[in-house]
């Protein structure tokens, strides 16, 4: 066990520093913005140092473990730890949150509250990735919802209250399934009630009961991921939220659902996952085609990007259903890859809106001439979204293809059919991505309009864009950096819990 509480500090620091915002002198928003940005940078550097010097890549076991008794008779403890599956999302959380804080500098209304909520959300998002106790996982899962709801309801478009209410109804309803599943696992343990991940992973349940738990957890995580038909909150939320909030939603929040499917459904309920995996493959293929077909019909720019996120999450679901090392590693790479790409696209959509004050694509056109930097970065990241070779999206989807084709669970014809449908989805992706670029940047609609001069991307915005673009290219060229984190844990997970 690690004797220095690295993970506790990493979780507690942002929200504690957020409370100190209330005591900062009232000297305008500049002090608050710089304070929040410095806290995020310190947190990211602290996380990188702790993982860089104290995390062993070749060890599939839980590392940086902490265990402090809390409520003894319930076996509820402050139990933290990370492994190869959770380290990537935690680093992604720190990176995207830091850039989202920098992106939020134009926010001036209630700046003190806004930045406090950003830091509280930071703690709430790291919590589930590092929890090793089921009840602590649930508490962190719920803690993160409160700042998200307030960020959605207080800053955004005209229908922000509607989208925030829809978000909280969906997520709070799904949390009931999560809590019931956790209590069920705790009380159904064969020896004594337990809430620890490690102990629960070694428990065996009757098949019918395990399937019931699996369905409950799946519903809870399907809302967050999101998985159709529980996805309808996402386009509305993205369409109305401020773009810095959208960066956190697309880059981190959706990945929490996928992480939950791996950490609980796959690791704790292996037999049920093996039974339901063919259905995951079916749902994933339907989701890819459905979202890719629906996206071109969206007039709202951010809603179109939101549906592209739904389509990309379909690839992750298929990777989880493949039940082999290649497929699961590809799914984890897709989680990281889309975290960067989704956050970047929403940031660029928001910076475009700051200039032209238009949300509908059919009202845009001709922006490439007036804002060439935004046009260039938007084009490159759209290419990354449609899996251009050399970008992280291409590597992730290619490995997912290999994962399906090498899976031992499915017949050859089934694998060919799934691969064919996925290929159709990959063909549809350039249709909505390239048409989005055409409607926004090509033509002369805005260029010939009166007052058509727009200021191009400034140093701050260009820095945020490039900071996200560089990891996308780096992972596309050298994906082994991500695989070196997860490959040993994935191998241990599948060898221990799945039987052909």
Curated annotation (Swiss-Prot):
Pfam families documented for this protein: Proton_antipo_M (PF00361)
Protein keywords: Chloroplast, Membrane, NAD, NADP, Plastid, Plastoquinone, Quinone, Thylakoid, Translocase, Transmembrane, Transmembrane helix
One example of a Gene Ontology biological process annotation: electron transport coupled proton transport
Predominant subcellular localization, coarse grouping: plastid
Subcellular location: Plastid, Chloroplast thylakoid membrane
Top-level division of the source organism's lineage: Eukaryota
EC number(s) per entry: 7.1.1.-
Entry GO terms, CC: chloroplast thylakoid membrane
Catalytic reaction annotation: a plastoquinone + NADH + (n+1) H(+)(in) = a plastoquinol + NAD(+) + n H(+)(out); a plastoquinone + NADPH + (n+1) H(+)(in) = a plastoquinol + NADP(+) + n H(+)(out)
Annotated transmembrane regions: 4-24, 37-57, 84-104, 111-129, 134-154, 167-187, 208-228, 242-262, 272-292, 305-325, 330-350, 386-406, 416-436, 462-482
First-level EC class: translocase
Membrane topology of this protein: Multi-pass membrane protein
Alphabetized InterPro entries for the sequence: NADH_Q_OxRdtase_chain4, NADH_Q_OxRdtase_chainM/4, NADH_UbQ_OxRdtase, ND/Mrp_TM
A molecular function (GO) term: NADH dehydrogenase (ubiquinone) activity
Homology family: Belongs to the complex I subunit 4 family.
PANTHER family for the chain: NAD(P)H-QUINONE OXIDOREDUCTASE CHAIN 4, CHLOROPLASTIC (PTHR43507:SF21), NADH-UBIQUINONE OXIDOREDUCTASE CHAIN 4 (PTHR43507)
Record's protein name: NAD(P)H-quinone oxidoreductase chain 4, chloroplastic
Species, as recorded: Morus indica (Mulberry)
Gene: ndhD
């Amino acid at each position: 066990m690690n004797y220095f509480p690295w993970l506790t500090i990493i979780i507690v620091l942002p929200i504690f520093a957020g409370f100190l915002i209330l005591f900062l002198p009232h000297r305008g928003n500049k002090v608050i913005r710089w304070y929040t940005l410095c806290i995020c940078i310190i947190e990211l550097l602290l996380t990188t140092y702790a993982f860089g010097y104290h995390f062993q890549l070749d060890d599939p076991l839980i590392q940086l473990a902490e265990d402090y008794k809390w409520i003894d008779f319930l076996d509820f403890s402050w139990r933290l730890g990370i492994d190869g599956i959770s380290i990537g999302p935690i680093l992604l959380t720190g990176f995207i949150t830091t850039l989202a804080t920098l992106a939020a500098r134009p926010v001036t209304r209630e700046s003190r509250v806004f930045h406090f909520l950003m830091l509280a959300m930071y703690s709430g998002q790291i919590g589930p990735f590092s929890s090793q106790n089921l009840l602590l996982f649930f508490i962190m899962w719920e803690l993160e919802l409160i700042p998200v709801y307030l960020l959605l309801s207080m800053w955004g478009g005209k229908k922000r209250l509607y989208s925030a209410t829809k978000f909280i109804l969906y997520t709070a309803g799904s949390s009931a399934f999560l809590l019931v599943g956790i209590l069920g696992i705790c009380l159904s343990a064969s020896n004594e009630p337990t809430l620890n991940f490690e102990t629960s992973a070694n428990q065996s349940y009757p098949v019918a009961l395990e399937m019931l738990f699996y369905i409950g957890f799946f519903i809870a995580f399907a809302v967050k991921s999101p998985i159709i038909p529980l996805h309808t909150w996402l386009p509305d939320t993205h369409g109305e939220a401020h773009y810095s909030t959208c960066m956190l939603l697309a880059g981190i929040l959706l990945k929490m659902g996928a992480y939950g499917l791996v950490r609980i459904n796959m690791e704790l309920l292996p037999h049920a996952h093996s039974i339901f995996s063919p259905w995951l493959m079916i749902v994933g293929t339907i989701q890819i085609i459905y979202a890719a077909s629906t996206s071109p019909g969206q007039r709202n720019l951010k809603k179109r990007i939101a549906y592209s996120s739904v389509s990309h999450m379909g690839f992750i679901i298929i990777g989880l259903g493949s039940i082999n090392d290649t497929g699961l590693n590809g799914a984890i790479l897709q989680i990281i890859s889309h975290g960067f790409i989704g956050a970047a696209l929403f940031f660029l959509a928001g910076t475009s809106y700051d200039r032209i004050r238009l949300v509908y694509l059919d009202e845009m056109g001709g922006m490439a001439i007036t804002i060439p930097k935004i046009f260039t970065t938007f084009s490159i990241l759209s290419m990354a979204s449609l899996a251009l070779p050399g970008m992280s999206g291409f590597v992730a989807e290619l490995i997912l293809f290999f994962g399906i084709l090498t899976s031992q669970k499915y017949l050859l014809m089934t694998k060919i059919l799934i691969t064919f449908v996925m290929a159709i989805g990959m063909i549809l992706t350039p249709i909505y991505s390239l048409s989005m670029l055409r409607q926004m940047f090509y033509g002369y609609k805005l260029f010939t309009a009166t007052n058509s001069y727009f200021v191009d991307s400034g140093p701050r915005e260009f820095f945020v864009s490039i900071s996200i673009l560089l990891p996308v290219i780096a992972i596309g060229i050298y994906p082994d950096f991500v695989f070196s984190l997860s490959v040993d844990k994935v191998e241990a997970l599948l060898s221990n819990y799945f039987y052909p």
